[in-house]
């Protein structure tokens, strides 16, 4: 097939596919609007050091001798050696998504592959980056083991954007200029996606974010998609739970004034909660406040008569949400958006996080007989979370669009 001149067909297919992939939220204990490109500010470090098809390791935490030998061979275009070494690496650490992607890229290299990109915050939040990569890696492996896309295997180029908007713009610009990149899975935070989306839109390159749900992303253009449901849906489900199930009539809310998704969630939650007859405490709680004091926030909320506290967490300020959880000591009922669904919440919140209610766009037990969770356990040795599932959906949507 031709390369980017097939994008219109891809967009039509994606529009249909993404409509089928909507997952909803669960609680548990055609005209292109071209925009001018924004200036791309400089950043420290070489862009080439941040992008790899298999010629360099980006996730330094997962280095081992076989993986290093594999990427060295890949860089020398010695694909048989790369395949053998990366396969040996995966036998030692099967749940390494970067190694899976490079392994499949090496196998696809000499078979007229189709290429996409995935951009994740390896240097910003490694756990989240690997969660997204797992979904992409699984979708790539499955399609390549089943004949590829019209007989052509899929390659995935990985970029590390650190969730830094200035770096995102550089990566987006590079991929738009690379006619072999047919679509992009990314980015993670809404601020990152909002930085890259106008560049992809102007360059007619499809971008699908599995995790960005800020309201502003929806209006950028017809090449911009996401697999995560709207932030309004997330806020509505949590607000209804607080009032109807948990019977909390007055809540305090913490958000990050510097993160668009966090602010979007706060605005939507307040509107939904107010419409249902609830009351929002007027205490100030901003995760970006330089002198943020979690204990003071809890004390002020209790003094103001709040019965619960909603955490509109942001990826860059997750630690401050965890500080709130630890400082709470069970005094307020805690609820949070899907951003706080991370391993760090369990690791650092521990017993203080018990009873907290999270909104999530996907859960392995939410859809009976869904084959994805079972297959994911075989790949990764345990359950995956919503970021992996929606990254898998994003990649599957691109695959469907390219067929």
What are these regions (language model features)?
Residues 118, 175-190, 207-210, 250-256, ...:
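Periplasmic-binding protein-like
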Residues 110-135, 140, 251-256:
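Short beta-strand segments enriched in small/hydrophobic residues
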Residues 325-393:
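Extracellular/periplasmic periplasmic-binding protein-like sensory domains
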Residues 77, 93-113, 127-131, 149-216, ...:
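Beta-alpha junction/loop-to-helix N-cap segments that form part of ligand/metal-binding clefts
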Residues 128, 206, 215-240, 350-363:
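Short beta-strand elements at the ligand-binding edges of bilobed clamshell
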Residues 35-110:
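Alpha-helical protein-protein interaction scaffolds
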Residues 48, 137-156:
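Signal peptide-proximal N-terminal region
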Residues 140-141, 222-287, 307-308, 398, ...:
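An alpha-beta-alpha
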């Amino acid at each position: 097939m031709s390369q980017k001149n097939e994008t219109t067909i891809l967009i039509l297919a994606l529009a249909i596919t993404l409509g089928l992939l909507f997952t909803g939220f669960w609680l548990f204990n055609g005209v292109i609007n071209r925009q001018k490109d924004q200036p791309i500010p400089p950043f420290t470090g070489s862009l080439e050091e941040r992008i790899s098809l298999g010629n360099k390791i980006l996730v330094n935490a997962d280095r081992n001798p076989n993986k290093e030998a594999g990427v060295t061979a890949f860089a020398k275009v010695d694909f048989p050696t790369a395949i053998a070494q990366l396969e040996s690496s995966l036998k030692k650490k099967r749940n390494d998504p970067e190694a899976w992607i490079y392994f499949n890229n090496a196998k696809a290299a000499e078979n007229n592959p189709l290429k996409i990109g995935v951009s994740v915050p390896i240097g910003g939040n490694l756990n989240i980056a690997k969660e997204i990569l797992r979904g992409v890696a699984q979708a790539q492996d499955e399609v390549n083991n089943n004949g590829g896309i019209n007989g052509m295997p899929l390659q995935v180029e990985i970029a590390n954007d650190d969730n830094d908007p200035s770096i995102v713009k550089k990566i987006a610009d590079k991929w738009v200029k690379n006619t072999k990149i047919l679509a992009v899975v990314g980015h993670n935070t809404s601020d990152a996606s909002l930085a890259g989306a106008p560049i992809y839109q102007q360059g007619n390159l499809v971008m699908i974010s599995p995790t960005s749900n800020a309201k502003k992303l929806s209006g950028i253009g017809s090449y911009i998609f996401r697999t995560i449901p709207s932030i309004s849906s997330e806020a509505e489900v949590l607000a209804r739970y607080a009032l109807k199930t948990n019977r909390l009539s007055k809540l305090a809310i913490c958000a990050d004034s510097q993160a668009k998704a966090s602010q979007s969630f706060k605005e939507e939650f307040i509107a939904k909660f107010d419409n249902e007859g609830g009351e929002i405490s007027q205490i100030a709680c901003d995760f970006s406040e330089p002198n943020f004091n979690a204990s003071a926030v809890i004390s002020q909320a209790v003094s103001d008569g709040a019965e619960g506290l909603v955490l509109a967490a942001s990826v860059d300020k997750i630690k401050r949400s965890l500080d709130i959880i630890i400082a709470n000591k069970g005094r307020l009922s805690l609820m949070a958006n899907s951003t706080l669904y991370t391993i760090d919440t369990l690791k650092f919140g521990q017993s203080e996080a018990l009873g907290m209610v999270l909104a999530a766009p996907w859960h392995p037990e939410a859809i009976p007989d869904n084959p994805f969770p079972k297959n994911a356990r075989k790949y990764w040795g345990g359950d995956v979370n919503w970021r992996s599932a929606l990254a898998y959906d994003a990649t599957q949507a691109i695959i469907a669009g390219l067929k």
